[in-house]
Amino acid sequence: GWADPYSNAIPRMLSGLTCPRKGLIGPWAHEYPQRALPGPQIGFVQACLRWWDYWLKETDTGIMDEPMLRAWMPDSIAPSTHYEECPGRWVAEEKWPPKNNESQTWYLNRNGLNQNAETDKPMLFPTSQTVGLNAGVWFPMGAAGEFPGDQRSADSGSLCFTSEYFYDGMEILGNPEATVMLSADQTEGLLAARLCDIAPD
């Protein structure tokens, strides 16, 4: 699911494999979809049986007539370290990557995040090793306290780039990529990029 650290593997495998394949991404943490949190859960065992019956028993279950990818498109929700349910809806793509795929490039500028590169002048920033303590558990199973909470504490110790408000909404299905040029005055470092939905309040 989207709360699982391996969520990027699904679109990557759908793109890279040439064998018959199906992808399923729900709102879940690293747990079986019939019992995973956050909900909604699905009949995962029944879906698996339809796949196995088709390929192992040559029973026409209709599974291969269905879209290549089914994914949960989450709605905006207030930050919390635990959710019982994630509001949203199921979406489907016949092929992956989809034919109507639209890629956008956004630039990290001094005045925020936008679609025009404004300067290549470096931005200097002293970092703190405590940034990220509230990032949640890397391998969540859906237990209380495992998900990332309010990110304002991490923002206070980070370089932040905020876009204008998306009045028409913005939906992302897939795995965003970040390309950054940087230098450091230390021999080792760690770069973390966060893509956050900012609440209006």
Predicted regions and their residues:
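Active-site phosphate/pyrophosphate- and oxyanion-stabilizing loops and adjacent acidic/basic residues
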Residues: 11-12, 50
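Extracytoplasmic/periplasmic substrate-binding proteins
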Residues: 13-17
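Acidic beta-to-alpha connecting loop that harbors the catalytic carboxylate
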Residues: 2-3, 28
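C-terminal, loop-rich substrate-recognition/catalytic regions characterized by aromatic stacking residues
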Residues: 39-201
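Conserved alpha/beta-hydrolase "acid-adjacent" motif
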Residues: 3-10
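Catalytic histidine-centered segment of alpha/beta-hydrolase-like enzymes
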Residues: 30-41
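Catalytic histidine neighborhood in serine/cysteine hydrolases
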Residues: 18-32
